[in-house]
Amino acid sequence: SSTIISVMLGVDYKIAVILVSVVVTIYAVMGGLWSVTLTDFVQVFLIVFGMMIAIPFALKTVGGWDNVVATLPKEKFYMVNSSINPKTIISLIVMYLASFTVGQEAVSRYYAARDDKAAVQGSLLAGLINIIYAFIPTVLGLITLALVTNGTIPKDIIMKDGPKYALPLLAMHTMPSVVIGLLFAGII
């Protein structure tokens, strides 16, 4: 959220962090778990569909998927590099299962479910959405890298501020204002 605010309004990142923290805290305290749940639902919808809509605009700007493939080195398209082995994959799975399923943000939603069946259904749906969602930012990241490589997106901004600015910069350079607004509304 702070990154989006920083890019859109041109304010310092630290000021954006403070601003977002104050707004989110007030909203969550005044509305409780119900307001947070509603916000989660709207955010998931806007982020997933906003990013899906973003792909065609970004591909049009870069000149199509063939240009992405032609611009980037082959190794950028490998899902697993040589440093990842079965032990690493198992360790990551154990770490994610042990941390995300017992985190406060997840547990509070389990206990807020109407009944056990709703908790299981919600967890399964969230897992399915996360599996689908895992690939969308990857595609957008590859397109952004191609646009930085060919000079459409200035490399100095990414080098100065880091990769956290990749999605906002991609959006600002490739998408109409309405799509940017929907996407950023979901992220914020």
PLM regions and their residue ranges:
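Helix-loop-helix connectors at the membrane interface of multi-pass transporters/channels
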Residues: 1-16, 112, 169, 173
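Transmembrane alpha-helical segments of multi-pass small-molecule transport proteins
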Residues: 5-35, 184
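Interfacial helix-loop-helix linkers and transmembrane-helix boundary segments
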Residues: 35-42
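N-terminal hydrophobic or amphipathic segments with adjacent small-residue motifs
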Residues: 4, 15, 22-26, 44, ...
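Short intrinsically disordered, low-complexity coil segments enriched in acidic
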Residues: 1-6, 61, 187-188
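Gly/Ser/Thr-rich beta-alpha loop segments that engage phosphate groups in nucleotides
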Residues: 33-34, 143, 188
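Residue-level recognition of transmembrane alpha-helices
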Residues: 17-21, 40, 50, 123, ...
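Loop-to-helix junctions at membrane interfaces in multi-pass transport proteins
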Residues: 45-183
